Amino acid sequence: MFLLLLLFLHLKGLQAGQNPQKTTLQTTVPEKISSPDVETDAEDHMAYLITINETPHFIHLKKQSFITPTAVVYTYDRNDVQHSQPLSALENCNYNGYVAGFPNSIVTLTVCTGLRGIIQFENVSYAIEPVETLSGFVHVIYENTNKHAVIPDLGKNQSYSWFDESDYQFRSNMKKSGFTVLRQRFIMMDIIVDKKLFDYMGSDTEVVLQKVIQIIGFVNTMLSKLKLTVLINSIEIWSKENRIRLSKAVDDLLVQFSIWKHEYRSQHVAYLLAFEEHPASTGALYPGNLCKLEYNAAVALYPKGLSLESFSVIVLQLLSIGMGLTYDTENCHCTGEVCLMTPKAIYSGGVKDFSTCTLDDFKYLSTRQDLRCLQDLPLERKPARRPRRICGNGILEMNEQCDCGTLKNCTHRKCCDPMSCRLKNKATCGSGECCSQDCTVKMNDVVCRKSVDECDFVEYCNGKDPYCVPNTYARNGQYCESGEAFCFEGRCQTADKQCMSMLGKYVRGASFACYEEFNSRGDRFGNCIHNFCAFRNSLCGKLICTWPFKKLVLKANLSVAYAQIRDDLCVAMYKGGRIPKTTKTTYSNPADRDETFVNDGTICGPDMFCLRASCTETRFHMDSSKCDSTRDCNDHGVCNNLQHCHCDIGYNPPFCEEHKGQFGSVDDGHKYHVEDGKSYKQQSHSNLKKNQLQLILYISLPLLVMISAVVIKQSKLSRVCDRERSESDSSTTEDSGSNTNVTSSGGSTSH
């Protein structure tokens, strides 16, 4: 009975999500099994035994990599302050594959927090997800349907006015000769979730993030036949409020989003996922313009009651039309009953595939310049490897409740089992800088990471998490050393400090003449990586120090060259080793530099610092649109590495408004003052309005009194004048009456 109750509650939770029309509810406990692929390559393959409708099915999976190593998710807190978090933890969670014994089947799953995704057979799709209220890896499976969802077509007969077949090359005019074999290509994408969709999906950032990644996973599974993969560059969730004005007209919404996109996400394709209960169309974009920066934006509308599977088809169709593809005609055929580029694909369950028409069109389009933005290789992509859980390494990893270190060196013996990395008894936490020896999370404002430099900030326990908050430090390019140097990656970078670190406390950075002497040589003792340093980059190549001693430099594995420049004995260094054949300057890549090169961030001119052996202006590396110390920090703080204000003592974050005893930032973990749910910025705005009203009252009240006095005075004068005028008129009338009587008498007399 208790199990049934939990399942009922879970079903109600599902109904609050993306698709209330779920049928054939059943439970299963997926069993992880071995297979030849798993035995050969366990890093990239998985296999599960999953029971559906009382029939066991063998599921074979292969890793699906589409989250870039640098991908981030942006969210907003209750003060509307933006926070960013890397998506690297989810990079190796996505898989796709097939059901053994069913040639026309497709499986798309995420596996890091239970199995979530779609199992597609020929005519039916099943969704699977864990029952979080039950232990034992219990999952629920249900058939995906859209019986009551109102799904409009994405076509020219809808309100979607951007779609016009005249904008396209018709298939009949396409040259379909000389096609080459398709090669793997990639599309970099930024994804934005609007506030209404965030609320519709549950108002939980983690849940919404999971669903967005599932959607892109489904899209990539369908795109595999085109050898195309969408890479997630960023996901932004408008959890507080929408950043643009939303319009009922999807065309207007696209224009508004395009303007926002070009200001904040200008480098890649951007999609806005928005909720509309009963939309007139499924989205809008600029057809055939995927690779044009001014037009590579799209809006996908999520109708009420739609499944994630169906919405992924909408996104896929929009993406296809953006590439220049069109809807299938009755002459187009595919391996399954439903082709992807048809309206029917949105509300149909089961496997869907591209038609031969679409494949031919894509092969043709991929040879043209219109799709030049499709990359042959993902930029700076590292080999994706599934993280191995190592209990006892002191790092909290997937499926671990705690990790206090080895059995010998466990930091929280009373709280965490070092063999299983599970919490003991009733422990709240079992490892981390903010976990006490009593197995509870430490209070707010306890220091968990000290500052190591004037550019580095102190971090505090936030009272919620057992681990210290991420490191915060001054933004790159912030002044330090009384304005004589710059902060870079949390350190005040100076040549003096670097020379002392290399050769001892009495050694200092050399003069410009010494740098120019050595770094113009273009050899192993003086260079800017590839060759000699250009004049403007002289201070950014090899580190040159002044040597104050008469004896030679004696340091293991270090070769030194000397030069007497005026009054200074200058030294340049080279770490021993074989010089590569490809270069005479020891290195061919700035990323490979050693400590004998000038550190990035070292000053090289007015408002300029060294970066990758070049002297560059700091303003190019400080995004003032996101954070400006004058505009955003009230001139009582500096911008940190997360683009938020770190306030001086006596000023309250996030906007550095004056408040006794306050300091720091919203990122350093300490408890800053918030009043009535409003930040001090909001409070100051309300105070400003109040002061403005008081000022208006103070000015207008005397003015009203003066005006009233004048009006009263004028009224009195008017009454006096009227009385005098009345008396004058009365006197005149009496005189006229006397004159009349005399005349009449006279008249009588004359008769």
Curated annotation (Swiss-Prot):
GO terms for cellular component: cell surface; membrane. Interacts with TEX101. Disulfide bonds join C291-C373, C332-C357, C334-C339, C448-C468, C627-C639, C633-C645, C647-C656. It comes from Mus musculus (Mouse). This is Disintegrin and metalloproteinase domain-containing protein 5. GO terms for molecular function: metalloendopeptidase activity. InterPro entries: ADAM_Cys-rich, Disintegrin_CS, Disintegrin_dom, Disintegrin_dom_sf, EGF-like_dom, MetalloPept_cat_dom_sf, Peptidase_M12B, Peptidase_M12B_N. Residues 17-142 form a propeptide. This is a non catalytic metalloprotease-like protein. May play a role in sperm-egg fusion. SMART domains: ACR, DISIN. Expressed in sperm (at protein level). Highly expressed in testis. Expressed in the brain, kidney, liver, lung, spleen and ovary. Subject to proteolytic processing during epididymal transit of spermatozoa.
